[in-house]
Amino acid sequence: MTALRNAALFYYTDKEKPMSEIKGRIHSTESFGAADGPGVRFIVFVHGCRMRCRYCHNPDTWSMEGDDTTVEMSPEEILSKALRYKSYWKNGGGITVSGGEPLLQIDFLLELFKQAKAEGVSTCIDTAGNPFTREDPFFSKFQELMKYTDLLLLDLKEINPERHKNITGFDNANILDMAQYLSEIGKPVWIRHVLVPDLSDFDEDLDKLNEFIKTLKNVEKVEVLPYHTLGKFKWENLGIKYTLEDTNPPSAERIDNANKRLCAGKYACKG
């Protein structure tokens, strides 16, 4: 990793413009993502997340410091790597930054998206919204970031604040405020809800979440994401107790119920 960082000091994308001093702490990248935004997308997974979602499938991204596999990369380096796959982005594809929580590295994200838009690249953020506040310095940076962001995938984990805290360790007031702000500025959003039996699958909460979503004027799509255990091994590798050991994925009936109540999937509401 040290060698990579030192080599990066001599990287240039333009003979007259040295590499940005801003670096992102990168966990990994995926060249052909098909589930995190429209079209085929280059996915950047960044480090750092304050929430501790009990079903998280990327707990290895929680730490801002990362581990021996973590690399520091400039926006130029990431964009250069992503643009190798631009020929696959003809149907609305582009770059999605996920994590971890991308908004914890907002300076890096802003610079990356500025450069991406200069190249005509579609930009998307996959976020749970936890860092959001209408206070500066974050808010002014976020407002600027939105000028270069085409779409946000916003994970609303629970509408009930106590249940949200049980899932993540935090309440959801600022996250719902972020959703409302994005509606105010007309920024396109896909709402996502991870459906976990006995944790985020309650009819009354699904109905309340739907009522909240209906107050927003910018929601293009709602997605129900059924709980799975594909990331459980990461918890074990990190020596962290997995508290959903006895929780099974939701049944087909409960998935259908959630889709219907949230106007998602085949029940997508028109107009």
For each predicted feature, which ranges?
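Generic domain-boundary/flexible-linker signal
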Residues: 37, 55, 64, 106, ...
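Conserved AdoMet/S-adenosylmethionine-binding subsite of the radical SAM
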Residues: 79-87, 91-94, 99, 103-225, ...
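Short glycine-enriched, charge-decorated loop/helix-capping segments at active-site entrances
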Residues: 61-63, 67-69, 165-171, 239-247
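N-terminal pre-catalytic segment of deacetylase/amide-hydrolase enzymes
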Residues: 70, 77-80
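N-terminal [4Fe-4S]-dependent radical SAM core
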Residues: 2, 9-72, 84-91
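Auxiliary Fe-S-binding modules of radical SAM enzymes
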Residues: 4-35, 80, 190, 195-271
